[in-house]
């Protein structure tokens, strides 16, 4: 007889794990460049949609179709008898739960190979992961295979899901090679920041939320006092390890880089979640604290290792999050298990080296199998349809070449720069601003003004109409707009541009690597004035833009010889009046 409580809980867990696809999509899109956003979203959609029928075809049978040491059984389309699993929930509910886990392993690979992988190749190797790679590893650890019979423990997938996905991600990124521009000829890494940390952060929050289904749902039961207590411990340990890991990563990067690194801290959250997944049911909260603490440091050192020493270009840090911390979490069971939930005690709880040895053996064999099989698959793909896109496609962006998508972002929007500057208001304007403290000479140096001569050519003189073109930081737009409106300027043309200056931003770092690009996001504001004094516009702009630092902006003043309003045919001053 089936348990309705357990069935509902397992389905809730499955639905939460499915929603992790949204978290992965946002993380990967945010940590990569805008020109590849559509490709990232497409890959995260398709690995689930390809993996689902593949897992139904033979994957589930290989994983759970029997109790053989190496494989479960060959059961196409899940037609066999699975009573040996001893489930108190319907088989199809269990299949749904396992399917979303399989899809997660395939999704992990997408991030490390982002921005240069052939989309056809991605579809092929995602199918291979769901057909044979993940199911066979899963059988060894969860389906009654030889590792499970030895006592290997991985409650929710540090090894079976994250380590497997992470080791494939590492191999794939290594075989692909780095993105164009990631390393110079001397092997020095260059930071390639993601385009949208907001999306990346939202992805992390979604993943953290869904992890309660990933780990908590793996209990498959809430019908007894014991299983309710176990699920509560699992969820508490999951949250604690993630929170500790996040704090440690923030503090560690603050000490190491001089400032707390945002993207690395976000990865620190995921690192703690991955690391606690194997032992969340069998370690105490103190053990979870230590596991999260180590994960927070490990993810930073791992990113630096793969960037600077191994020269494996991983745009989103997937290898460091899932492989490095999947390994750590699996080993941690052999160190911190207190013997709960029928698991052998770890080294620090009087269990000796027995459980630790089993955990290490499992990792070595699983990773060796995955590396061997995926190496062959990647090489076959590379020799046939090609694993990597041509340089031209990579430079232009995969969106336009692979999907015919000019941009994943329609329309035009003003975005804020990564700046702590506040727009002054009655609550923030507390006194003297930077401009009022500066001398005229300082302001002229910080915000240069270039004026076109009054005589343009062939005796054509100043008409009294001028175009003022202002190049400034994105974060200053609202202040500048308000100041111009106060002068009576009601019409302006605004464009987002990239500025190339002499400053190299040497103090800025991304994942510990100095950002040395000279192209910086700017805003260009153009206004045409006649009755309003040009000097008043210039002085107002200088006052709002001035901070005293390189990059405050520039102002260009041009003579305008003629203006024509298309709607009415009016010219010059009359054309500048916005009336019906």
Regions found by a protein language model. Name each.
Residues 401-405, 420-580:
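Positively charged, small/polar-rich N-terminal and surface patches that mediate targeting and assembly
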């Amino acid at each position: 007889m089936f348990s309705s409580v357990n069935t509902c809980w397992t389905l809730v867990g499955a639905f939460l794990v499915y929603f992790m696809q949204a978290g992965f999509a946002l993380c990967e899109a945010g940590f990569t460049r805008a020109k590849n956003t559509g490709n990232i979203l497409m890959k995260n959609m398709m690995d689930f949609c390809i993996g689902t029928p593949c897992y139904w075809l033979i994957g589930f049978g290989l994983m759970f179709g029997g109790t053989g040491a190496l494989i479960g059984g060959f059961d196409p389309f899940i037609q066999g008898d699975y009573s040996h699993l001893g489930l108190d929930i319907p088989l199809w509910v269990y299949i749904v739960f396992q399917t979303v886990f399989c899809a997660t392993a395939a999704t992990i690979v997408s991030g490390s190979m982002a921005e240069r992988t052939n989309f056809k190749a991605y579809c092929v190797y995602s199918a291979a992961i769901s057909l044979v790679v993940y199911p066979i590893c899963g059988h060894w650890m969860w389906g009654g295979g030889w590792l499970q019979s030895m006592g290997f423990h991985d409650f929710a997938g540090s090894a079976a899901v994250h380590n497997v996905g992470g080791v494939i991600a590492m191999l794939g990124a290594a075989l692909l090679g780095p993105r164009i521009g990631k390393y110079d000829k001397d092997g020095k890494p260059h930071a390639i920041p993601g385009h949208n940390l907001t999306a990346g952060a939202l992805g992390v929050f979604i993943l953290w939320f869904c992890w309660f289904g990933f780990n908590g749902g793996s209990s498959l039961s809430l019908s007894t006092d014991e299983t309710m207590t176990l699920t509560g411990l699992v969820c508490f340990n999951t949250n604690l390890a993630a929170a500790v890991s996040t704090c440690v990563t923030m503090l560690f990067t603050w000490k190491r880089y001089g400032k707390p690194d945002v993207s690395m801290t976000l990865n620190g959250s995921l690192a703690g979640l991955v690391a606690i997944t194997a032992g969340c049911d069998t370690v105490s909260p103190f053990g979870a604290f230590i596991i999260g603490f180590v994960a927070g440091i490990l993810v930073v050192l791992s990113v630096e290792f793969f960037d600077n020493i191994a020269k494996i270009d991983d745009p989103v840090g997937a290898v460091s999050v899932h492989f490095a911390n999947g390994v750590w979490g699996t080993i941690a069971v052999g160190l911190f298990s207190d013997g709960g939930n029928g698991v052998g005690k770890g080294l620090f709880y009087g269990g000796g080296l027995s459980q630790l040895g089993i955990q290490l053996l499992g990792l070595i064999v699983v990773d060796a199998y995955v590396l061997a099989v995926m190496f062959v698959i990647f090489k076959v793909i590379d020799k046939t349809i090609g694993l990597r896109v041509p340089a031209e496609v990579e430079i232009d962006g995969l969106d336009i070449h692979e999907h015919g998508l000019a941009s994943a972002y329609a329309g035009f929007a003003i975005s804020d720069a990564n700046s702590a500057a506040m727009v002054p208001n009655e609550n923030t304007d507390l006194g003297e601003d930077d401009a009022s403290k500066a001398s005229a000479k300082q302001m002229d140096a910080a915000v240069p003004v270039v004026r076109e001569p009054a005589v343009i050519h062939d005796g054509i003189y100043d008409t009294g109409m001028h175009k003022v073109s202002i190049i400034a930081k994105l974060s200053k737009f609202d202040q500048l707009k308000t100041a111009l409106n106060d002068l009576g300027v009601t019409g302006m043309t605004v464009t987002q541009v990239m500025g190339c200056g002499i400053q190299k931003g040497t103090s800025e770092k991304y994942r510990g690597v100095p950002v040395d690009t000279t192209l910086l996001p700017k805003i260009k504001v153009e206004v045409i004035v006649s009755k309003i004094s040009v000097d008043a516009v210039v002085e107002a702009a200088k006052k709002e833009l001035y901070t005293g630092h390189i990059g405050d902006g520039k102002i260009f003043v041009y003579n305008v010889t003629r203006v024509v309003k298309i709607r009415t045919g009016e010219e010059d001053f009359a054309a500048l009046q916005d009336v019906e």
